[in-house]
Amino acid sequence: MNGKRPAEPGPARVGKKRKKEVMAEFSDAVTEETLKKQVAEAWSRRTPFSHEVIVMDMDPFLHCVIPNFIQSQDFLEGLQKELMNLDFHEKYNDLYKFQQSDDLKKRREPHISALRKILFEDFRSWLSDISKIDLESTIDMSCAKYEFTDALLCHDDELEGRRIAFILYLVPPWDRSLGGTLDLYSIDEHFQPKQIVKSLIPSWNKLVFFEVSPVSFHQVSEVLSEEKSRLSISGWFHGPSLTRPPNHFEPPIPRSPHIPQDHEILYDWINPTYLDMDYQVQIQEEFEESSEILLKEFLKPEKFMKVCEALEHGDVEWSSRGPPNKRFYEKAEESKLPEILKECMKLFHSEALFLLLSNFTGLKLHFLAPSEEDEMNDKKEAEAADITEEGTSHSPPEPENNQTAISNNSQQSNEQTDPEPEENETKKESSVPTCQGELRRWKTGHYTLIHDHSKAEFALDLILYCGCEGWEPEYGGFTSYIAKGEDEELLTVNPESNSLALVYRDRETLKFVKHINHRSLEQKKTFPNRTGFWDFSFIYYE
């Protein structure tokens, strides 16, 4: 009898359970050959192109939108579920606040793996063909989740090797009122961002990609929804780096020496407590210990009230300060200020205040203030007297620097061994103390950023706050000090009405004002006419 002998019964074969393989297919925008040629031609000629499945625009820089990138809704829902199960980490600094997953480069979830495959194989090949850029196989993608008040401020994405950025949105029904738009900036004659000229609203399954260049300035606007999350996958395709245009350096802000003004101005303006010499000694001891201090109720109440009234109801001319990749706030036109505000500005420029600040801090901001050299000479004279009287001698102590700037320990030690300060000492001895300052208005959306050309030097920062009643730290608007190259904050100064903040910083310390978010509008519930706060911001140099 012909036939196969039945297999002997035995134990079932045990092996690893294989994960179900998932396939993803993308839009006709990528697979249709005629369309591909048209898109490639538009890219090459830098001309707009519009089709129902793909739109390319050149204004303000080359960007492209594919409204329905993945064909299968089931795939997208599976992908969303896997992403929501990832661990997210809060990302927080001067530039952004949102949650980000770990790198998706090696995740094994089926839908994430399938998306990674089509993006960095098939789609990368299509992008290389239409852009004529030799894109590398480098995988660079992660998942971001933006919730209420999260934002990513103005930047250009430029980093060695990044050539094309992409974002795939997986959001619930979304409109402009929810925030979270991808805002694109025009540029000025110096290739710096100028203003938002286009906003792309996230939508489910929309893919946006754009060419990364020295002018690809964009931001993710603050998310205003308290219920909905803005979920997206984003990353970059890498290739040969572009040549950057020469760096643009802003003209330095002029510094001026003190205005001759006698001490009467202090008695007119400042709380008498702070003019008591014994109290000034206490302040200096505390300041030398920590390099910062907050002096509450600094101005006399009647003067402070008049200043606040002029700020709230006076005819102050404000102008916006940018560019937005460095700062966004309003500055008062000093020459057109109401008289009381002019007088307040004069106070901070005055010779008497320079001397008072010297007494508060131990810094030599006035020729009458004792310097470290004076203190050393006094010590030497005392030692010489001891030698004469006792007929003995001993080694003089090492010079001491009583004033330590806000910094971390490792940086302080670098400062002490750096030969550069010696070179500057001669300049310092012959230089005249100077200052620069402005009156600023802070409202929702305002901020300052640390940037590549942020100048770090020894300086005393002074801030006097007005109109901060009811202001909470969660609104933003506080000033943060960080060590250069680090995200960890060394010091945070929160706005507090009629409080004078003094901070001495070194060349390894940078500062920024945190983005003011939409929670700040809650201030209006208590103060209907308020839309933020003001500060007098000055910097003093020895």
From Swiss-Prot:
Ranges of compositional bias, category Polar residues: 400-416
InterPro entries in UniProt: Oxoglu/Fe-dep_dioxygenase_dom, Oxoglutarate/Fe-dep_Oase_C, Pro_4_hyd_alph, TPA1/OFD1_N, uS12_prolyl_hydroxylase
E.C. number(s) listed in UniProt: 1.14.11.-
Residues annotated as binding Fe cation: 155, 157, 218
Top-level taxon of the source organism: Eukaryota
Pfam families named in the record: 2OG-FeII_Oxy_4, Ofd1_CTDD
Residues annotated as binding 2-oxoglutarate: 169, 230
Annotated keywords: Cytoplasm, Dioxygenase, Iron, Metal-binding, Nucleus, Oxidoreductase, Vitamin C
Subcellular localization, as worded in the UniProt entry: Cytoplasm; Nucleus
Cofactor note: Binds 1 Fe(2+) ion per subunit.
Keyword rRNA processing in annotation: no
Residue intervals of the Fe2OG dioxygenase domain: 134-239
Cofactor needs: Fe(2+); L-ascorbate
GO CC terms in record: cytoplasmic stress granule; nucleus
The keyword Hydrolase appears for this protein: no
Membrane spanning stretches: none
Described purpose of this protein according to its UniProt entry: Prolyl 3-hydroxylase that catalyzes 3-hydroxylation of 'Pro-62' of small ribosomal subunit uS12 (RPS23), thereby regulating protein translation termination efficiency. Involved in stress granule formation.
Family: Belongs to the TPA1 family.
Quaternary organization: Monomer.
Name this polypeptide is given: Prolyl 3-hydroxylase OGFOD1
Record lineage: Eukaryota, Metazoa, Chordata, Craniata, Vertebrata
